[in-house]
UniProtKB/Swiss-Prot annotation:
Predominant location category: membrane
CDD domains: CYP58-like
Protein name as annotated: Cytochrome P450 monooxygenase oblB
Domain of life of the organism encoding this protein: Eukaryota
Membrane topology, record value: Multi-pass membrane protein
PROSITE patterns named among the record's database cross-references: CYTOCHROME_P450
Reactions the enzyme catalyzes: ophiobolin F + 4 reduced [NADPH--hemoprotein reductase] + 4 O2 = ophiobolin C + 4 oxidized [NADPH--hemoprotein reductase] + 6 H2O + 4 H(+)
Amino acid sequence: MSSIQLQKYLDLLPENAILNAGIAIAGLSAAYAIGLVIYRLYLSPISKFPGPKIAAATFWYELYYDVIHKGQYFHKIEEMHEKYGPIVRINPHELSIRDPDYYDELYVSGSVRPSDRYEGFVNGVVDFEGSHLATVAHELHRKRRKPLDPYFSRAGVNRLEPMVADLTEELVVKRFEEFKGTGKVVRLDHAFTAYSGDIISALCIDEPPHFTSTPDFTPSWFDLFHSGVVTLPLFMGLPWLIHLIRLIPESILAVIDPGAQNWNTFRMMCYDSIKDTKREKGAQPTKDTSLLGRPTLFRHLVNSDLPASELSDERLLREAQVLIGSGTMTTAGTMCFLVYYIKSNPEIHRRLTEELKPIMEGYPHKKPSWAEIEKAEYLQAVLKEGLRLSFGTIHRRPRVSPNQPLQFKEWVIPAGVPVGMSAYFQHTDPKIFPNPHEFNPDRWLSNVTPAMKKNYVPFSKGSRHCLGMNLAYCELNYIIATMFRPGAVDFDLFETTELDVKPTHDMVVPLPSLKSKGFKVKFN
């Protein structure tokens, strides 16, 4: 319609009609907003639960602390619990519980009751729809996770162990010893992200990226996940932004956000691998994957009996992105945390190296197995303390009981209401862990109480516990044992403080201070 024709129709409208229409729309919008607030405050199924009225009325309260204050709503929730008690309403839809005795009641196996994921959480997780992690319904999640479990079980990771051992040797012996005597400053957060990325990629796809062997450990790989995680609170608060961004052509998006190219490169790495695996399947007359090459998770999935809808390129692409992304960043962050506290505490360093002497003797010509490394009691205490204080995730993990209400003390939580608990609260309860913010491996060597074991939840619990738990333990055992064995290459912390490793921001994935210039060490 031309501007002349549009003006013709506008001239036919009564005087002030456009103004009146605008006023009417504004009035209806205001009435809707007021009605919504009244419903949330007084008529909602969770209106009787304690908590600040502003949090019950609007999501903007949470968005303010997580976007403007960069992932600080978990501290606000902590304040709410201090004021209102063990159960609080933290937004219009969701409850938070802080009670060490209730964790095992909320995070249960599928045989106890189904546990759905909170749809509001899933909607803001960028580009992961269709993956097991972003699946809302319990039964569909179970079907999607079942074929993944064997690859991440203890037995599955044991089969992967030789590759983990070889990559550890490549990083710590080949790469780090190149720097011996050079005084070279290295970003360990880049090195560990490359290492973990190579391991999880080798498990999933046929051609891992070999980031560990690149000169500077491919900083763009670290930047890809770090920059993506920083945006998560915004997208979780305003999920419609994701759909808006998808309307922008990739060529324009690359100009607006240069980091988008890293994401596209990652997507294409996953997509190309999946397409190659499908082409391989089409050319192979048998389902025997042992004839196809190195066993990988996605070779197994493509050749499985899953329905065609579960094997679409797009769904498998997103599953690959989730598995590789989540298997890279949190494990690398825990490695940085552990190395910092070991190097910052000479007595911990000394005891650890002394214990590792008989186990790592002859390395790398004689490599100990993961099971042999696990016999080092002090090392296991160090790892547990590192996982306790790096939390896995700080963010509460909301669960929904779709069919039956939950009972918490005198409170009946209606079916369908998302309820979350946080490893941060479980791991920093002073009644369970005295001086909870102190890095003290000795707490795991004597007087270990049942409450300590019960409330140690870096990988969560229940039917949706962290898939990569065994792989993370394997990597942590190998990397710490190898770096701190007697005779390992010597290095010192360089322009690095606790702020560079300590979880400070809850961006769903915990991050250290956003002012950090990276975790750096200098090789002597």
